[in-house]
Curated annotation (Swiss-Prot):
Mg(2+) binds at E253. Its cofactor is Mg(2+). Tetramer of two alpha and two beta subunits. PANTHER family: PHENYLALANINE--TRNA LIGASE, MITOCHONDRIAL, PHENYLALANYL-TRNA SYNTHETASE. GO terms for biological process: phenylalanyl-tRNA aminoacylation. Belongs to the class-II aminoacyl-tRNA synthetase family. Phe-tRNA synthetase alpha subunit type 1 subfamily. This is Phenylalanine--tRNA ligase alpha subunit. Its EC number is 6.1.1.20. It catalyses: tRNA(Phe) + L-phenylalanine + ATP = L-phenylalanyl-tRNA(Phe) + AMP + diphosphate + H(+). SUPFAM superfamilies: Class II aaRS and biotin synthetases, tRNA-binding arm.
Length: 328
């Protein structure tokens, strides 16, 4: 047991020389581990005579405590040095120039909406709005689509609680506006609409704008004039050819699809329209014997695709900044 002091001094020297926490733990294992040098001394106490065992045990325990104290002090020093180095590495240099902010811009669909709404404002239309979660009455019944009507199969609808729906078109805005206003009525109704559909040219959520003009003496000729003027101004082509093909919509009579002749000489469908059905006027408490009106609807996403040359509708909704910043 005469070498206790020598082992302690060697241990304290090794602790002082440890360069990091890993090396420090290796030193601890060397002296206090299962087969450590001080541990081995404790194992040998049983070989001593009883009168020597007590004094030898006290000496070894004092050496062990001294080693642990040196170890703990060194560990605290290394932890403090590690923290200081970490803080220095993460420190903010306030003298460095700041990062420039990147200017944002409107989404291409929003740009298209604003452009179209602006064109119709110059023709005397005002912009109306309404809820996206709509009752069955305003989404269907007020538009001459009663329960079990076959026209309901034309649209795949998202139903929510209390028999409400995510509106399948912005026509409910027109129904609500007619219910709360008397003619003359001249509005456009843009907004998000929802249908169960998704591919390169369809999305379960997309944007529509519908227009409505109700007044005494409004005719299909007025409808053709307004729509044709709008399309020529939007596409910036005074010679743009527009045609109206007979079609069917339950809320209009007569009804038509709207086509334009593109630069490749092909007819392209861009919307639907028609004279407001007398039943729709009656449901809104507007006298169909006194007033007539027309309505039309266009897809804002489709018009944005045409204006900006985008072939896949889904690009508008993927939030790819490399794509969107082209329109800033």
């Amino acid at each position: 047991m005469n070498n206790v002091d020598a082992i302690l001094q060697a241990g304290q020297a090794a602790v002082a020389a440890a360069a990091d926490l890993i090396e420090l733990e290796q030193v601890k294992a060397r002296f206090l581990g299962k087969s450590g040098e001080l541990t081995e001394l404790l194992k040998q106490l049983g070989k001593l005579a009883p009168e020597e065992r007590k004094a030898a045990g006290a000496t070894i325990n004092q050496a062990k405590q001294a080693f642990e104290a040196a170890h703990n002090d060194k560990r605290d020093q290394l932890n403090a040095a590690k923290l200081e180095a970490q803080l220095a590495a993460e420190a903010l240099d306030v003298t460095l120039p700041g990062r420039g902010s990147v200017g944002g811009g409107l989404h291409p669909v929003a740009l298209t909406l604003e452009r179209i709404a602006g064109l119709f404002r110059t023709m005397g239309f005002e912009v109306a709005d309404g809820p996206e979660i709509e009752s069955d009455f305003y989404n269907f019944q007020a538009l001459n689509i009663p329960e079990n009507h076959p026209a309901r199969a034309m649209q795949d609808t998202f139903y929510v609680e209390n028999c409400d729906v995510l509106r399948t078109h912005t026509s409910p805005i027109q129904a609500r506006f007619m219910e709360s206003h008397q003619p003359p009525i001249k509005i456009v109704a843009p907004g998000r609409v929802y249908r169960v559909d998704s591919d390169a040219t369809h999305s379960p959520m997309f944007h529509q704008m519908e227009g409505l003009w109700v007044e005494e003496g409004v005719s299909f000729a007025d409808l053709k004039a307004v729509v044709t003027d709008f399309l020529r101004r939007f596409f910036e082509r005074d010679d743009l050819q527009v045609r109206f093909r007979p079609s069917f919509f339950p809320f209009t009579e007569t009804s038509a699809e709207i086509d334009v002749l593109d630069e490749q000489g092909k007819w392209l469908e861009v919307g639907g329209c028609g004279m407001v059905h007398p039943k729709v006027l009656s449901i809104a408490n507007i006298d169909p014997e006194k007033y007539t009106g027309f309505a039309f609807g266009i897809g804002l996403d489709r018009f944005a695709m045409l204006r900006y040359g985008v072939n896949d509708l889904r690009l508008f909704f993927e939030n790819d900044l490399n794509f969107l910043k082209q329109f800033n």
